[in-house]
Amino acid sequence: MKHGLTAAYTILKNEIKYIEKWLYYAKPFTYRVLLDTGSTDGSWELLQEYASKDAGLIIEQKTFDPWRFDVARKYNLAMVPKNVVWCLSPDLDEYYSINTLETMEKLITDIPDVTSITSDRLDIYSRTVRVGPPNFMPTNKIHLRADYTWSQPIYEHLAWIHKDRYEKEVYCDEIYLVHDQDFKKQERPELYIKMLREEYQKNPTNTWCLWFLVYHFYKSENLEEYIPAACNYLKFDKNRNSNNYKDLMKDLIMLYHHEQTLNQQQKLLIKQTLDSIQ
């Protein structure tokens, strides 16, 4: 690409079934950078075989204890050669549409100060196939290599590293990220909830992780933990115009006035929280 070298990078563990396909779709990029975090299913051996035939394939195996997604992602990003300008970070079960590079080139030519590109994701095993605006946030996985880092131990996301200048994120409806999720793969809700609880104990003001924990309590109908967690979210979240904030406000008001099972302590906590932010 005339706007600089490119690299697709991601982490994996025991995902041997996806390696060949991911490498095929990532072939147009200058580099393919894969971090194996402890596979035991033959993934690492297969990667070594491919790397022996592909000078643009950079691989490493490293385990992390304790596990944090952002730490692994940061390490993976650091593996990307320093001369790379644009990075793409599709998971191993995700593939960018074949028009991605040419579309990026046109977009960057038209908007030279762009720092990241968001796109729609197609979840082919989901009832809601297209993930993108206006109903959902688009996927932000295309970014300048030198200007972003990974943040949050779970449900990690890219974060702008500069304080003296602003990022410029551009949405492109011509690029698609296809999510070919393994419907047979066992989900890991217990691990995720454990990590969210640990983060909440260490850093109760981290509203990014707290939101997912609140949502888990809500779905589980666990009022005992939901109410104090939701109240803390409203207390610490600075964006009072967000949908998350407004939805929690409405739900706590409804609980306060209509939920018959609330005890006096729960009602008092809700009232104090609502009074403090109105």
Spans of features found by a protein language model:
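Cell-envelope/extracellular polymer assembly enzymes that use nucleotide-activated donors
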Residues: 5-7
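Catalytic-site signature of metal-activated, phosphate-bearing donor transferases
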Residues: 69-77, 96-225
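A conserved acidic beta->alpha catalytic loop
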Residues: 35-47, 63-66, 91-94
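Short beta-strand-to-loop acidic/aromatic patch adjacent to the donor-nucleotide binding site
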Residues: 83-97
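Residue at a conserved register position within TPR or TPR-like alpha-solenoid repeats
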Residues: 217, 256-259
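Active-site nucleotide-sugar/metal-binding loop of Leloir-type enzymes
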Residues: 74-86
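Alpha-helical repeat scaffolds
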Residues: 224-235, 263-277
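Short, well-formed alpha-helical segments that are part of the catalytic scaffolds
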Residues: 9-29
